[in-house]
């Protein structure tokens, strides 16, 4: 017999349900986990509890970086078509920079990498919502690390 590999995809219908908020949440989480890792490393004495905690923090940080890459690739590859690309021809370069920064966040524990990634994600988010004709505004995230994110201005009920 042969083994069938597990395959995952967005829906490929296309469903038209795309939202970069998951990417923003993951990027904020990366910065938060970098902060927690660096706090943990400030302790002069590393012990098994610290090491276990560091292992968990690094693992979850890397999961979020992987999610950033996956979600950005899905929106870029499935949502962005010729009309959006014509309007924003630099989106390919932006996506490449996001991929590189997400990898850097996996490789290193430097806060500035996470903050720079968030800036690129915010730019991607602005472009995404603009392609849908939805205005955006900048707000502080209501949880640590309390950095600026781009939010769509939604219709009131």
Predicted features along the sequence, with ranges:
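N-terminal intrinsically disordered, cationic/polar leader segments
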Residues: 1-54, 90-121, 127-147, 151, ...
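Alpha-helical segments in soluble extracytoplasmic regions
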Residues: 47, 51-72
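Short, solvent-exposed, charged loop/turn and helix-capping segments
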Residues: 71-88
